[in-house]
């Protein structure tokens, strides 16, 4: 199993394009990134962006449009239209690409120096836990994207029905930031396994119907309950906040206990309302001990695995 990072200007361009078109109003939309990416846009470009936005929003599966754009599979008229009308904007994007290209090259080389040999057995156990064959753990490609200079950390996206991950690393490169980038890559790789799991879908749906619907709990702001269940499990596997099941291999440290992180979370509660991301990480941490037992004992995912996290949501969101 190998994870290979690469630079592809066309992939990065279409990611930039969909961001500046502002088609997405979900939790995935990042306003600071939008602002940075958009600073090169001129008034004359707005009709193009409006048309791109309309095409993506009108599709029954907008994320499939994005997957095909990133894969450069222009196999219908809307995809070909987006590629055609957006071509003049490549010059706008070029200044952003050139500004970070040198650092992206360093990140590509660093990521490709990572070894995943020590993670392969653990990832195979995770596949079994999800009801997948061990051979579901396969090679993946990481396409690097321009980050914004002020970004506090790396961010990634696992593209459904593909073998690739989109990654915005830190804007600057140094050895201390490698660990965070590696964790994000494995978090997104975990999403790829979760996306394949019918058992996860069944367990999540059953948990939602049993615990969420009867109490009419409202999901954390910016998230649907479907995305919450996905993130709960992915954070349990790899997280910059709670470490996750893979923490010993990724950081050389065990993941923290609930009691160890409780003072920090309670300070957040006392000072201000925690972010949705912080709430989901905190809930994931409560799942982690039992999830670890399931994986090590080769038990498959079921509804019960989510119950510790649901109790946290019940306390915080009711």
List each language-model region with its residue ranges.
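Active-site recognition of the HExxH zinc-binding catalytic motif
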Residues: 179-199
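Acidic, His- and aromatic-enriched active-site or binding-groove loops in soluble protein domains
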Residues: 158-177
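Soluble non-cytosolic domains of exported or imported proteins
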Residues: 8, 113-120, 176, 180, ...
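An active-site-proximal "capping" alpha-helix that borders the catalytic cofactor pocket
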Residues: 126-129, 228-243
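N-terminal low-structure segments adjacent to metalloprotease catalytic domains
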Residues: 1-98
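Auxiliary, metal-adjacent structural segments of Zn-dependent hydrolase domains
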Residues: 99-161
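Post-HEXXH active-site segment of zinc metalloproteases
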Residues: 196-226
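Pan-zinc metallopeptidase signature
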Residues: 238-240, 246-318
């Amino acid at each position: 199993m190998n994870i290979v990072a690469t630079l592809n200007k066309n992939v990065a361009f279409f990611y930039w394009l969909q961001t500046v078109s502002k088609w997405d109003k979900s939790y995935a939309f990042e306003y600071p990134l939008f602002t940075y990416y958009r600073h090169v846009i001129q008034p004359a470009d707005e009709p193009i962006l409006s048309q791109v936005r309309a095409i993506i929003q009108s599709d029954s599966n907008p994320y499939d449009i994005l997957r095909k754009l990133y894969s450069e599979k222009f196999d219908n008229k809307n995809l070909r239209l987006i590629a055609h009308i957006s071509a003049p904007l490549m010059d706008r994007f070029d200044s952003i690409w050139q500004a970070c290209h040198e650092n992206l090259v360093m990140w590509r080389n660093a990521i490709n120096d990572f070894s995943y040999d020590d993670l392969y057995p653990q990832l195979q156990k995770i596949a079994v836990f999800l009801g997948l064959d061990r051979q579901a753990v396969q090679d993946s490609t990481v396409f690097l994207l321009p980050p914004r200079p002020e970004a506090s950390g790396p961010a990634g996206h696992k593209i459904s029905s593909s073998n690739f991950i989109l990654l915005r690393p830190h804007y600057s490169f140094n050895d201390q930031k490698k660990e965070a980038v590696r964790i994000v890559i494995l978090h997104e790789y975990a999403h790829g396994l979760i996306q394949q799991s019918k058992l996860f879908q069944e367990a999540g749906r059953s948990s939602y119907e049993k615990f969420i619907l009867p109490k009419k709990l409202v999901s954390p702001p910016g998230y649907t309950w479907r995305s919450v269940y996905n993130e709960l499990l992915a954070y349990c596997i790899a997280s910059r906040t709670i470490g996750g099941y893979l923490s010993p291999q990724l950081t050389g440290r065990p993941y923290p206990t609930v009691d160890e992180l409780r003072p920090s979370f309670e300070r957040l509660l006392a000072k201000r309302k925690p972010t949705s991301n912080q709430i989901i990480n905190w809930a994931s941490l409560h799942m982690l001990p039992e999830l670890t037992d399931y994986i090590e004992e080769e038990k498959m995912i079921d509804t019960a695995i989510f119950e510790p996290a649901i109790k946290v949501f019940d306390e915080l969101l009711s």
